[in-house]
């Protein structure tokens, strides 16, 4: 019995190493037709080849009309932003790139913040901080909003107890009323999916949870806030005719939860 347990443990360790060093998956979700969106999220300090070329090549093969980066392109402790910059440049050659800050961009160590902002200024992504951009693709006009919520929804007083709660009214204060038409909302934190839908976004693209880090039988284990079994961790969640689209992301250690790029057809 011990012999079998040792073999299982060795196989588990080998798979863990393989998953975290070599795997990169593409998940495709067909929600409509006419526009292809590539969703990249939560890279953190992970690297996928020289200049993150594996990510760029996978996205290129999908021929997207739009590329979304839903936060945590870097980690708060990062000092070398050249891999992130190379990724931005590579993606921009494929399609328009829209991005938002995640909780890590909001809390980058002060000594590195200037270098990070300079890196962004050299590139041509469209950074949305409680702002909106309009894009016409295949005769359809999309209004793309980027939400920068209060950091208290992620961490408060150095911990994860009594976090701030985001309501529809808070979103309206930050973004204004949701307009008519096709509205995409980029919001790093998926836990407020119902509120995003109430605000009126047809599609909300989120990340943050890393798919739950560890997944068993398709269920997420843990959120970054140290909460077990997070409700919105990976996949498509319906709120009437509105949808929350959550990527499991690319970075951080994970098990039975491969790094992913997501392609949505809407």
Predicted regions and their residues:
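Non-catalytic terminal accessory segments
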Residues: 1-25, 65-66
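Binuclear metal-dependent phosphoesterase catalytic core
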Residues: 13-34, 138, 213-266
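Short, flexible loop segments at the rims of nucleotide/cofactor-binding pockets, characterized by
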Residues: 16-19, 43-48, 74-78, 159-164, ...
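A structural signal for the hydrophobic beta-strands that form the central parallel beta-sheet
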Residues: 39, 69-70, 205, 246
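Membrane-embedded segments
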Residues: 40-133, 141
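Conserved catalytic scaffold of divalent metal-dependent phosphoesterases
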Residues: 45, 105-203, 233-236, 240-266
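Short gly/pro/ser/thr-enriched loop/turn and capping motifs at secondary-structure boundaries
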Residues: 105-106, 211-215
